[in-house]
């Protein structure tokens, strides 16, 4: 099996270079593998599937075109786009996964997550996450007028950016105990996640067993991704955005 893993693109009109990189990526590296896994924060924010902007439509069309070539598409929601639903998924021809999701990758267990569930030192954020991930809360929120939803989201984004300036850097990273607990609960797999914007390859020894953890990079003026072919180990690569190479 061959697959690419990406996260934290934060697509929006204000980031045209990232948009160009993403569309080029879908026409390039993504067509050379069997599966593409998008592990959250594909969009800068998502107010609901009824907010069909030209950008959103262009992204869904590009993903659907990739699916037409035979690449299977999977999306695991992030903290910015957890309201993305089945309507968009149908248009984009992708499957939405729960967080976390354990997959069988050539007879090896691989655990996928956006990664924010591991940042347990940030107790304020975890309380907020539990609230907004509750299905009842989401249903009530999506029943509000679109303009009101977008206003609320803009306010939350401002609060989030302000709070980041006041938080210690370490509480916004993953908690080692949370990582080890998750690995133990899922049979000591390889873990792939994003969210922290701290790309790295870690090895955790849990109950005497070595478990790899790959942290995906966020996108700026290039397009970082993790490629994994069944015959070898994962490889972190970058697809040049500005040059399209």
UniProtKB/Swiss-Prot annotation:
InterPro entries in the cross-refs: Calcineurin-like_PHP_ApaH, LpxH-like, Metallo-depent_PP-like, UDP-diacylglucosamine_Hdrlase
Annotated EC: 3.6.1.54
Annotated localization: Cell inner membrane
Residues annotated for substrate binding in this entry: 79-80, 122, 160, 164, 167, 195
Enzyme class, UniProt record, top EC level: hydrolase
One cellular-component annotation, GO: cytoplasm
Keyword Membrane: yes
Cofactor(s) this protein requires: Mn(2+)
A Pfam short name: Metallophos
BP terms from Gene Ontology: lipid A biosynthetic process
UniProt cofactor note: Binds 2 Mn(2+) ions per subunit in a binuclear metal center.
List of residues binding Mn(2+) 2: 41, 79, 114, 195
Entries under Gene3D superfamilies matching the protein: 3.60.21.10
Pathway assignment: Glycolipid biosynthesis; lipid IV(A) biosynthesis; lipid IV(A) from (3R)-3-hydroxytetradecanoyl-[acyl-carrier-protein] and UDP-N-acetyl-alpha-D-glucosamine: step 4/6
Gene Ontology molecular-function annotations: manganese ion binding; UDP-2,3-diacylglucosamine hydrolase activity
Amino acids binding Mn(2+) 1: 8, 10, 41, 197
Keywords: Cell inner membrane, Cell membrane, Hydrolase, Lipid A biosynthesis, Lipid biosynthesis, Lipid metabolism, Manganese, Membrane, Metal-binding
Record field: catalytic activity: UDP-2-N,3-O-bis[(3R)-3-hydroxytetradecanoyl]-alpha-D-glucosamine + H2O = 2-N,3-O-bis[(3R)-3-hydroxytetradecanoyl]-alpha-D-glucosaminyl 1-phosphate + UMP + 2 H(+)
Topology class, membrane: Peripheral membrane protein
Disulfide pairings: none
NCBIfam families per UniProt: lipid_A_lpxH, PRK05340.1
HAMAP family: LpxH
Similarity-based family: Belongs to the LpxH family.
Function as written in the Swiss-Prot or TrEMBL entry: Hydrolyzes the pyrophosphate bond of UDP-2,3-diacylglucosamine to yield 2,3-diacylglucosamine 1-phosphate (lipid X) and UMP by catalyzing the attack of water at the alpha-P atom. Involved in the biosynthesis of lipid A, a phosphorylated glycolipid that anchors the lipopolysaccharide to the outer membrane of the cell.
Protein name: UDP-2,3-diacylglucosamine hydrolase
Taxonomic source organism: Aromatoleum aromaticum (strain DSM 19018 / LMG 30748 / EbN1) (Azoarcus sp. (strain EbN1))
Lineage: Bacteria, Pseudomonadati, Pseudomonadota, Betaproteobacteria, Rhodocyclales
Gene (name only): lpxH
């Amino acid at each position: 099996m061959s697959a690419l893993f990406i996260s934290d693109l934060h697509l929006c009109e204000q980031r045209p270079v990232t948009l160009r990189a993403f569309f080029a990526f879908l026409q390039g590296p993504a067509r050379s593998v069997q599966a593409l896994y998008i592990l959250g924060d594909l969009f800068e924010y998502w107010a609901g599937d009824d907010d069909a902007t030209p950008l959103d439509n262009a992204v869904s069309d590009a993903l659907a075109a990739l699916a037409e070539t035979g690449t299977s598409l999977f999306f695991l929601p992030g903290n910015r786009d957890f309201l993305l639903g089945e309507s968009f998924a149908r248009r984009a021809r992708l499957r939405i996964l729960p967080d976390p999701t354990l997959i069988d990758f050539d007879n090896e267990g691989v655990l996928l997550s956006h990664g924010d569930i591991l940042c347990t030192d940030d107790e304020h954020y975890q309380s907020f996450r539990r609230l907004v991930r509750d299905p009842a809360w989401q249903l009530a929120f999506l029943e509000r007028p679109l303009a009101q939803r977008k206003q609320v989201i803009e306010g939350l984004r401002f609060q989030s950016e302000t709070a980041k300036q006041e938080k210690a850097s370490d509480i916004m990273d993953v908690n080692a105990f949370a990582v080890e607990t998750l690995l133990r609960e899922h049979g000591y797999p390889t873990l792939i996640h994003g969210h922290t914007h701290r790309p790295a390859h870690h090895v955790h020894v849990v109950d005497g067993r070595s478990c790899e953890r790959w942290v995906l990079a966020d996108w700026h003026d290039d397009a970082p991704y993790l490629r994994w072919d069944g015959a070898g180990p994962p490889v972190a690569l970058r697809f040049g955005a500005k040059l399209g190479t």
